[in-house]
């Protein structure tokens, strides 16, 4: 059944004060990598707190198709990996559904194997460019046997007999490209080097070291990172407790800031500094966000967040902050809609190649609901209305349903918006929220949100 046939609209209405304690699902980036590295490592890997959304499950299914043994026992996932260099050729195509991270990282992981692998995805993923990952793989000797024009899925790869290590400078701020090259380096003799001018989320580096990879990072005087990985070493299974996803935490967090009288606590949130751009920006806007019980879990910083309703003010978000909050701009734009003055977001070119053209999807949704905003090539300026006065769907019969374009973050962001606008906000489809945050509806309504 297609997404279109199964579309489930949803409407959010002005809510009473939100209150209570919530725990968001496990971090998506760490969950994908836990399945991948556990499936590749020798011995047993045990994972608690894994995000059981559709995207991560697709990565798990791909690893199983290549020889890993993965099962759930109670609240824990137990994996017996193949050993580095010992993945098997899958019998059929690897279907990644909507999972951009899973597909791009797996292309890196298996691309340097002397075997044929085909990658397919849903309509949204099949429209996303994969050339940025295929380009360094081609340099390592990987053949792209089949691809849809524009390096889009379906894509069939065949690795070389012996892959060549490369030094690759990542041309854009992309953790996915960096990670794909490092993972390709795992099955490549010698040392593969990635040069990263702008630091992006560093879960791949941290976790590979935890699994025993010979990986080192040097930062030069200009702040450029050089990441070295020695191929064909042994990876050993680990025990992983996945912290809460800061991108998912952004939704209840912004909801509490904009719904008057709210006071909530979000527990066990990942506080890795490459992921806290939204938190920092909302604090600069005047958001009352207290960081409680900061602690270290499995090499990552974790904390609880107490969030209270706040009168927000517009700010200019520095463009260099974009990599640390690239997935959070839609919900930041919602917060900005209730702030006094203008919020300017720049350096957003990566939003054009996400699950949807996320920048235009946000701008169109805001305008439909009465928000004064200006969309640039790589920027968005939002002029807010404190209290949400006059915002929300127009009652005069015009269809103001927000088109989510099969994008889970657009869907959740606009449902958050409707909790504080004068009039309700409706989205065309909530079905794809399950890709990253299956518990979203239950968690939000449990805090008091009016969403149906």
From Swiss-Prot:
EC assignment: 2.5.1.19
Identification of the protein by name: 3-phosphoshikimate 1-carboxyvinyltransferase
Localization per record: Cytoplasm
Comp. bias intervals (Low complexity): 1-17
Recorded GO CC terms: cytoplasm
GO molecular function: 3-phosphoshikimate 1-carboxyvinyltransferase activity
GO biological process: amino acid biosynthetic process; aromatic amino acid family biosynthetic process; chorismate biosynthetic process
Pfam family, one: EPSP_synthase
InterPro entries: Enolpyruvate_Tfrase_dom (IPR001986), Enolpyruvate_Tfrase_sf (IPR036968), EPSP_synthase (IPR006264), EPSP_synthase_CS (IPR023193), RNA3'P_cycl/enolpyr_Trfase_a/b (IPR013792)
Involved pathway(s): Metabolic intermediate biosynthesis; chorismate biosynthesis; chorismate from D-erythrose 4-phosphate and phosphoenolpyruvate: step 6/7
Active site feature: 327
Disordered, as annotated region: 1-26
Principal localisation: cytoplasm
CDD domains assigned to the protein according to its UniProt record, in alphabetical order: EPSP_synthase (cd01556)
Gene: aroA
Keywords annotated in UniProt: Amino-acid biosynthesis, Aromatic amino acid biosynthesis, Cytoplasm, Transferase
Reaction(s) catalysed (UniProt annotation): 3-phosphoshikimate + phosphoenolpyruvate = 5-O-(1-carboxyvinyl)-3-phosphoshikimate + phosphate
Function: Catalyzes the transfer of the enolpyruvyl moiety of phosphoenolpyruvate (PEP) to the 5-hydroxyl of shikimate-3-phosphate (S3P) to produce enolpyruvyl shikimate-3-phosphate and inorganic phosphate.
Subunit structure: Monomer.
UniProt similarity note: Belongs to the EPSP synthase family.
Binding positions for phosphoenolpyruvate per the UniProt entry: 28, 100, 128, 176, 358, 409
Residues involved in 3-phosphoshikimate binding: 28-29, 33, 174, 176, 327, 354
Domain of life, source organism: Bacteria
């Amino acid at each position: 059944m297609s997404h279109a046939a199964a579309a489930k609209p949803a409407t959010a209405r002005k809510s009473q004060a939100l209150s209570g304690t919530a725990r968001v699902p496990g971090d998506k980036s760490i969950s994908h990598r836990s399945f991948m590295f556990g499936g590749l490592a020798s011995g047993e890997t045990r994972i608690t707190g894994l995000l059981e959304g559709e995207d991560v499950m697709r990565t798990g299914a791909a690893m199983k198709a290549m020889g890993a043994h993965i099962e759930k026992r109670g609240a824990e996932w137990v994996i017996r990996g193949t050993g580095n260099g010992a993945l098997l050729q899958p019998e059929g195509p690897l279907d990644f559904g909507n999972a951009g991270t899973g597909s791009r990282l797996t292309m890196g992981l298996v691309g340097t194997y002397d075997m044929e692998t085909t990658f397919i995805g849903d309509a949204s993923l099949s429209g996303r460019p994969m050339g940025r990952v295929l380009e360094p793989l081609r340099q390592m000797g990987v053949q792209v046997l089949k691809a849809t024009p524009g390096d889009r899925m379906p894509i069939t790869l065949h690795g070389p007999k012996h892959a060549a290590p490369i030094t690759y400078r990542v041309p854009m701020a992309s953790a996915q490209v960096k990670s794909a090259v490092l993972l390709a380096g795992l099955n490549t003799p010698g040392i593969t080097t990635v040069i990263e001018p702008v630091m992006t989320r560093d879960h791949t580096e941290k976790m590979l070291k935890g699994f025993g990879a010979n990986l080192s990072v040097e930062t030069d005087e200009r702040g450029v990172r050089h990441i070295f990985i020695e191929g064909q070493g042994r990876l050993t299974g680990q025990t992983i407790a996945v912290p809460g996803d800061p991108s998912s935490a952004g939704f209840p967090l912004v909801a509490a800031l904009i719904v008057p009288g709210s006071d909530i606590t979000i527990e066990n949130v990942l506080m890795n500094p490459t992921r806290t751009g939204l938190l920092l920006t909302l604090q600069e806007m005047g958001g009352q966000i207290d960081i409680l019980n900061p602690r270290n879990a499995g090499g990552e910083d974790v904390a609880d967040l107490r969030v209270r309703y706040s009168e927000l003010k517009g700010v200019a978000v520095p463009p260099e902050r974009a990599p640390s909050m690239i997935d959070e701009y839609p919900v930041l734009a919602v917060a900005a809609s209730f702030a006094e003055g203008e919020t300017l977001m720049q350096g957003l070119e990566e939003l054009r190649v996400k699950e949807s053209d996320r920048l235009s999807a946000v701008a169109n949704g805001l305008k439909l609901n009465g928000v004064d905003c200006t969309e640039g090539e790589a920027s968005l300026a939002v002029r807010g209305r404190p209290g949400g006065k006059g915002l929300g769907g127009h009652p005069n019969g015009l269809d103001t349903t927000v088109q989510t374009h099969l994008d889970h973050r657009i869907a959740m962001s606009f449902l958050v918006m409707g909790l504080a606008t004068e009039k309700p906000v409706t989205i065309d489809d909530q079905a794809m929220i399950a890709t990253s945050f299956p518990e979203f509806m239950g968690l939000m309504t449990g805090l008091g949100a009016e969403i149906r």
